[in-house]
């Protein structure tokens, strides 16, 4: 009897398990839009987990914004861990980088300099570059959490400043500034278009990575080789399939690409923001996402490969790795030609690329060749042709890579990490630590694939909420004043520092960039402070205002108790008490003589009144 009961229970359990198994056996489906590195990674990871994946790419080829170079410098496992893991997975061999390319070098007026050469032959330029690097390191050190760079109101304020203004304050020599501008353009965008907070955040990410680790080896064939390795693993790829619309309902996502329509459980959107803006989303994206699509800054880059019969540059100038030019040549490196000859890859970035926007490809190449020929007279005779990639004028990309402009971290930080219903987002622009890099694209593809699996498992996905700095925070930012004084060369007079946040727009920023005299002269409001004085005696008001303006130096000792607003208020009550005796003796001339003496007393409360009004502005 007992055995029969157990047998019946076993049959029931088996039936339940069978039903559950049938439900689980239903293969999950996903569509990946975008065949760049991020999309390829997401598709690969989902397929590896048993998903049926369809990848749609608008162009005839895959790999996205891969460069022209037939071999690419890559970092070691410390600098690019995800990239190196995929290289190991696909058994793609790399070649160790020679030592001379592992640090940046320079081409100054056609003369090649290593960092060691620069220190000997142009010590002033070398010293200025070192000073810049040290100051940048101090700036990066202030960001303790790169995933939440605006952790306090002081750092939050850096997002309102562009990098060019910060560089202006460093007073760099002309050549050093040109080289530094070129480096920033190449890695991000024009300094005047780049948020100082974003620049500091990126510097903090790489602060623990030695410059040499960023070019530790070479990948023969470039990133195209890695893209092809992904492609070989994927089962369903549709090229020449530009997506025009995405419709989400309760259980599915439907994608229209050309005349074809595809339906799946979930979707990974792995296209640049400008391309995303051309896709009709239903339900539509909210105002914040649409604002990010339209206004998020992308770096500009034109990449040109000039081909020569023979090397026309100095054979001793081993120009490779990163070589920054102080002229219009931008950043360049020598690219080995696979079939003999010699190639040079030139990157025009930032406003250098924007200026050339009106030029056709051949005109642009001619402009670059003219500059190269000025330094190497054999260039035109040995020149055989060119290849070009113009990311910024490509309607499908609208730029080369993410480069947050002033105020944009405040609005759009980590916005694209959150899935919207059944759609997850990938692409270098969605990665917090390594945007604009191959590493960032690979990481974002992994994250999006993981999010889609979480959504399929029924998990509610909430974004990492980064709370904006609280309003009262500036009052407790005394330690941050030291940070700014070291950054922008302010005086070490600590009592003056709290005046920085007094008026966030005029006073704080003028102080931030070395305008230390401006806040001290700012007792212009002091003229308004004595305005209550006319009530007791209109005549003495004129002599009171004049002395306050003439000796602003006296505000320095008075500002010591600037934080104590209550004692300052007491001094304001003493003013009428002292002026009353002046009323009682109007006829006597002697008290009139004493009146100027009392104006000396009036100066002090007036100056204190100026310091009292400043903290009030901060609170407001």
What are these regions (language model features)?
Residues 41, 252, 300, 316-480:
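Conserved flavin/dinucleotide-binding core of flavoenzymes
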Residues 28, 257-266:
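Core beta-strand elements of the Rossmann-like FAD/NAD(P) dinucleotide-binding domain
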Residues 269-287:
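Flavin (primarily FAD) binding-site architecture
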Residues 145-252, 261, 270, 404:
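Active-site/ligand-binding neighborhood in enzyme catalytic cores
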């Amino acid at each position: 009897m007992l055995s029969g009961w157990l047998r019946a229970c076993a049959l029931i359990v088996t039936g339940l398990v069978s039903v559950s198994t049938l439900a689980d056996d239903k293969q999950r489906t996903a569509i990946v839009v975008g065949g760049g590195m991020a999309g390829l990674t997401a598709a690969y990871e989902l397929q590896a987990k048993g998903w049926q994946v369809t990848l749609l790419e608008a162009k005839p080829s895959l790999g996205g914004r891969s460069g022209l170079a037939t071999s690419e410098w890559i970092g070691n496992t410390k600098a690019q861990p995800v990239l190196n893991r995929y290289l190991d997975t696909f058994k793609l061999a790399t070649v160790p980088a020679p030592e001379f390319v592992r640090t940046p070098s320079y081409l100054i007026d056609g003369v090649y300099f290593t960092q060691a050469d620069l220190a000997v032959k142009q010590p002033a330029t070398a010293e200025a570059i070192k000073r810049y690097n040290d100051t940048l390191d101090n700036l990066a050190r202030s960001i303790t959490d790169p995933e939440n760079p605006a952790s306090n109101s002081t750092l939050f304020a850096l997002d309102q400043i562009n990098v060019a203004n910060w560089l202006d304050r460093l007073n760099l020599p002309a050549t050093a500034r040109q080289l530094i501008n070129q480096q920033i353009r190449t890695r991000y965008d024009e300094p005047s278009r780049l948020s100082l907070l974003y620049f500091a955040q990126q510097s903090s990410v790489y602060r623990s990575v030695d410059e040499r680790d960023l070019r530790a080896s070479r990948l023969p064939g470039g990133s195209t080789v890695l893209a092809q390795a992904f492609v070989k693993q994927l089962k369903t790829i549709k090229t020449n399939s530009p997506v025009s619309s995405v419709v989400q309902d309760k259980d599915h996502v439907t994608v229209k690409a050309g005349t074809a329509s595809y339906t799946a459980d979930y979707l990974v959107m792995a296209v640049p923001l400008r391309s995303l803006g051309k896709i009709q989303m239903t339900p539509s994206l909210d105002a914040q996402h649409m604002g990010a699509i339209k206004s998020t800054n992308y770096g500009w880059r034109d990449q040109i490969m000039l081909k020569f019969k023979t090397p026309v540059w100095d054979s001793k100038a081993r120009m490779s790795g990163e070589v920054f030019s102080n002229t219009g040549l931008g950043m360049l490196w020598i690219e080995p030609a696979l079939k003999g000859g010699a190639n040079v890859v030139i990157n025009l970035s930032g406003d250098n690329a924007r200026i050339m926007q009106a030029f056709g490809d051949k005109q642009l190449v001619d402009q670059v060749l003219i500059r190269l020929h000025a330094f190497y007279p054999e260039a035109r005779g040995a020149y055989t042709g060119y290849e070009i990639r113009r990311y910024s004028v490509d309607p499908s990309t609208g730029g080369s890579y993410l480069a947050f402009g002033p105020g944009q971290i405040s609005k759009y930080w980590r916005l694209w990490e959150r899935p919207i219903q059944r759609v997850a987002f990938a692409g270098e622009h969605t990665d917090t630590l390594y945007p604009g890099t191959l590493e960032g694209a690979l990481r974002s593809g992994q994250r999006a694939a993981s999010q889609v699996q979480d959504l399929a498992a029924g998990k509610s996905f909430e974004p990492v909420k980064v709370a904006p700095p609280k309003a009262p925070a500036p009052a407790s930012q005394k330690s941050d004043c030291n940070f700014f004084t070291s950054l922008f060369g302010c005086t070490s007079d600590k009592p003056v520092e709290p005046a920085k946040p007094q008026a966030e727009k005029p006073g704080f920023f003028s102080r931030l960039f070395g305008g230390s005299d401006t806040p001290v002269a700012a007792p212009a409001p002091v003229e308004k402070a004595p305005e209550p004085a006319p009530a007791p005696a209109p005549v003495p008001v004129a002599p009171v205002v004049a002395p306050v303006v003439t000796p602003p130096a006296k505000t320095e000792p008075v500002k010591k108790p600037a934080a104590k607003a209550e004692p300052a208020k007491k001094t304001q009550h003493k003013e009428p008490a002292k002026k009353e005796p002046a009323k009682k003796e109007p006829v006597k001339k002697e008290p009139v003589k004493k009146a100027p003496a009392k104006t000396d007393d009036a100066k002090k409360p007036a100056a204190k009144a100026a310091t009292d009004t400043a903290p009030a502005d901060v609170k407001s």
